[in-house]
Swiss-Prot record:
A Pfam family annotated for this UniProt entry: BTB
Comment on protein domains: Both the BTB domain and C2H2-type motifs are necessary for transcriptional repression activity. The BTB domain is also necessary for oligomerization and efficient sumoylation. The hydrophobic cluster preceding Lys-328 enhanced sumoylation efficiency.
Protein localization: Nucleus; Nucleus, Nucleoplasm
Protein function: Acts as a transcriptional repressor. Represses cAMP-responsive element (CRE)-mediated transcriptional activation. In addition, has a role in translesion DNA synthesis. Requires for UV-inducible RAD18 loading, PCNA monoubiquitination, POLH recruitment to replication factories and efficient translesion DNA synthesis. Plays a key role in the transcriptional regulation of T lymphocyte development.
Annotated zinc fingers (UBZ-type), start-end: 533-558
Protein name per Swiss-Prot or TrEMBL: Zinc finger and BTB domain-containing protein 1
InterPro entries xrefs: BTB/POZ_dom (IPR000210), SKP1/BTB/POZ_sf (IPR011333), Znf_C2H2_sf (IPR036236), Znf_C2H2_type (IPR013087)
Cross-link (Glycyl lysine isopeptide (Lys-Gly) (interchain with G-Cter in SUMO2)): 3, 200, 205, 261, 266, 276, 284, 304, 316, 328, 340, 346, 381, 528, 563
Assembly and binders: Homodimer. Homodimer. Interacts (via BTB domain) with TRIM28 (unphosphorylated or phosphorylated form).
Disruption phenotype: Thymus of embryos show a small number of T-cell progenitors that are unable to progress through thymic differentiation. Adult mice show vestigial thymus and lymph nodes and a reduced spleen size. In the periphery and in the spleen, display an absence of mature T-cells, a reduced number of NK cells, but a normal number of mature B-cells.
């Protein structure tokens, strides 16, 4: 159980560090007065500083508040309140002080002065900026407090050359002995913080009040610590070596040793202290103040012998420390044994840059739903591996056509091996009929379709070379789809072939956007149709595998209803007045065509004015600027965590789900079961006003209306 004084102790140490300037990473200027502070403390107490540090992460070393209606006196008291939870002196005007706190958007603004004013402002337990002029000894943010002892006016301090402040304890005791005279000790000892001796207290309350009086000092760098554990952790990484190390290491513990009743006890204690290692027990660091000697001073000869014994013991301890090397290891987050059932996919820098095109599509009005599913790859010779993957939508510039489902080459399908084909991207050798599914499932982000002929090409140089010779006669048959008779019919009718290919491409596009791909095992069902998760977008027929639905969609082109949709697609092409001279894709506005050219040229013409990073698309730049400003587009309603991309927000929301719960991918509403989610999804569908048919995308509903209900003249 944590001690009740821990929070007060941490605040005290932070305030001491602020006064000393130790680890301060921010400077606040008000007129000609400068205040040092820690960003973490300011951001934890003030919403104003939190947002400022988020928006100006690279230029917050110094902050000027002179143009604000905040006086230096008020800000000094605000810093006291941030670091201590109270103020040491009353402000001249509490209303002005409260206005300044509200302006800085402090999370806790007091209603009255009595709530934050210290009951005993003269107490030295909590020092402030106003009391920083006290001559107490403080090393790197740790203030050394000592017992209140009766001294003569000219008596030297036991630890420091300057007098230090004391801690007021409930019960004052008369000292039982005089302090050790330091006249014969070297002068460098006065500059090093020594381990203060702690008296054995009778009550726990006294131990709490005396807690600030104990410190542990590093022999190498002189840093002071409040407990032995912090000192042990610091020693493992301490690399500082000062010139006074060899001359003072044997002294810093001997100073706290009082003269024993006999010289043998004193020499024994000195030798024991000098041979301590940093892994010793805590009781070896403590000295009993009640072990006071009867004599106030010892002879110079006995002191010298003690020092020599201490130096000899220290050399042995240094040799022991050199041989004993402690390496602190952190446990790995994901052990290798736990990862054996997961597919680990290495994403290159090129893939990350190209995948940003897909990430930005979530801002489009007709955005497809992101489907999260459990995929289980079950092979004959290998065990099943389960991975959770989001089904990403296809880029807008890739919607001009979809795969003819074969790697691009100059040979005709007749000359190729009818049984096997190799993937152009990963080199995997698979059958021709499975090649289409392989490209859809594995490489959808690295392929692009020609807008004129529909041939699938790998992004990059192949796409540009093909676009230059796309007007030349070439074999345009679709590989792996339909039978040989269907291919012959398509070759005899090139115009109909082009129309059918375009609509087939659009259907595959919508198929990827609008349907779930989930595990076929019954216990992992996410929706009631998970046994046959693949559905033809034209006739609604469901299939168990992706290969079956792709083959069915090629034969589904012959239906009259689908031909009507082809006519509707041709009729709306006349509205696209701006066409790309490389791939032939049409756009409604010239600015969209200009942005589309970056797909071919790979020219990143949109530059961030803050950091200089370049982007292909303007919406990528807008999203990047939002990250600079700290403006999260999606905020979790449970824990208030912000995300900039929708699919990242969905992944985060999934972490809040309990067993059996599911989440709507559109409005992020959580439902206890899949049946309620199915009923809720009707709210997000587009309904035909005439026949009541429902569609996921608005353009699908419009196509349905034009093909079914619009009277043609």
């Amino acid at each position: 159980m944590a001690k009740p004084s821990h929070s007060s102790y941490v605040l005290q140490q932070l305030n001491n560090q602020r006064e000393w300037g130790f680890l301060c990473d921010c400077c606040i200027a008000i007129d000609d007065i400068y205040f040092q502070a820690h960003k973490a403390v300011l951001a934890a107490c003030s919403s104003y500083f939190r947002m400022f540090f988020m928006n100006h992460q690279h230029s917050t070393a110094q902050l000027n508040l002179s143009n604000m209606k905040i006086s230096a006196e008020c800000f000094d008291l605000i810093l006291q309140f941030m670091y201590l939870g109270k103020i040491m002196t009353a402000p001249s005007s509490f209303e002005q002080f409260k206005v300044a706190m509200n302006y800085l958007q402090l999370y806790n603004v007091p209603d009255c002065l009595e709530d934050i004013q210290d009951a005993d402002c003269s107490s030295s337990k909590c020092s402030s900026s106003a009391s920083s002029r006290q001559s107490s000894k403080m090393i790197f943010g740790v203030r050394m407090y000592e017992d209140t002892v009766a001294r003569n006016g000219n008596e030297a301090n036991r630890w420091c050359a300057e007098p230090s402040s004391t801690v007021n304890t409930p019960h004052h005791r008369e000292p039982e002995e005089e302090s050790l005279q330091l006249a014969n000790f070297p002068e460098p000892l006065f500059d090093v913080c020594k381990k203060s001796s702690v008296s054995k207290l009778s009550t726990p309350k006294e131990r709490v009040s005396r807690r600030f009086g104990r410190s542990f000092t590093c022999d190498s760098c002189g840093f002071g610590f409040s407990c032995e554990k912090l000192l042990d952790e610091h020693v493992l990484t301490c690399t500082n070596r000062h010139s006074y190390q060899n001359t003072t290491r044997a002294y810093h513990r001997i100073v706290d040793i009082r003269d024993g009743k006999d010289s043998n006890i004193k020499a024994e204690l000195a030798e024991k202290d000098s041979s301590k290692t940093f892994s010793a027990q805590p009781d070896k660091y403590r000295e009993d103040a009640n072990q006071a000697p009867d004599d106030s001073a010892s002879t110079t000869g006995s002191r010298k012998s003690t020092v020599e014994a201490g130096i000899a013991g220290e050399e042995k301890s240094r040799a022991t420390e050199t041989k004993r090397i402690i390496i602190k290891m952190e446990p790995e987050d994901i052990p290798a044994d736990d990862m054996k059932d997961f597919n680990i996919i290495k994403v290159t820098e090129k893939d990350c840059n190209e995948s940003t095109d897909n990430d930005e599509l979530e801002d489009e009005p007709e955005e497809p739903f992101y489907r999260y599913y459990v995929e289980e790859d079950v092979g004959i010779k290998k065990s099943g591996r389960k991975t959770l993957k989001p089904r990403m939508s296809i880029s807008v510039d890739e919607r001009g056509g979809l795969e003819n489902m074969r790697p691009p080459n100059n040979t005709s399908p007749i000359q190729e091996d009818a049984e096997n084909a190799s993937c152009e991207l990963c080199g995997l050798t698979i059958t021709e009929e499975d090649l289409s599914s392989h490209y859809l499932a594995k490489h959808i982000e690295n392929i692009c379709a020609c807008g004129k002929c529909g041939q699938i090409l790998v992004k990059g140089r192949q796409l540009q070379e093909h676009a230059q010779r796309c007007g030349e006669p070439q074999d345009l048959t679709m590989n792996g789809l339909g039978n040989a008779d269907e291919k012959m019919d398509m070759e005899e009718n090139p115009d109909e072939q082009s129309e059918i290919r375009d609509m087939f491409v659009e259907m595959l596009d919508d198929f990827r956007d609008n349907h779930y791909q989930i595990n076929s095992i019954q216990k992992k069902q996410l929706f009631k149709h998970s046994a046959c998760p693949f559905r033809c977008p034209n006739c609604g027929q469901r299939f168990e595998t992706e290969n079956l639905v792709v083959e069915h969609m090629s034969s589904c082109l012959d239906q009259d209803m689908f031909k009507g949709a082809i006519m509707e697609e041709n009729e709306r092409d006349h509205r696209r007045k701006h066409f790309c001279n490389l791939c032939g894709k049409g756009f409604y506005q010239r600015c969209h065509l200009r942005e589309h050219y970056t797909v071919h040229t790979k020219e990143k013409q949109f530059v961030c004015q803050t950091c200089g990073k370049q982007f292909l698309r303007e919406r990528q730049l807008r999203l990047h600027n939002d990250m600079h400003k700290g403006m999260a587009r999606y905020v979790c309603s449970i824990c208030d965590q912000g995300n900039f991309r929708k699919h990242d927000h969905v992944r985060h929301m999934i972490s809040h789900l309990s067993g059996g719960e599911t989440i709507c991918q559109v409005c992020f509403q959580i439902f206890p079961n899949n049946e309620q989610l199915e009923q809720h999804m009707d709210v997000h569908l587009y309904t035909c006003g005439i026949c009541g048919a429902k569609f996921n995308l608005r353009k699908d509903m419009r196509s349905h209306y034009n093909a079914k209900h619009l009277k043609r003249t």
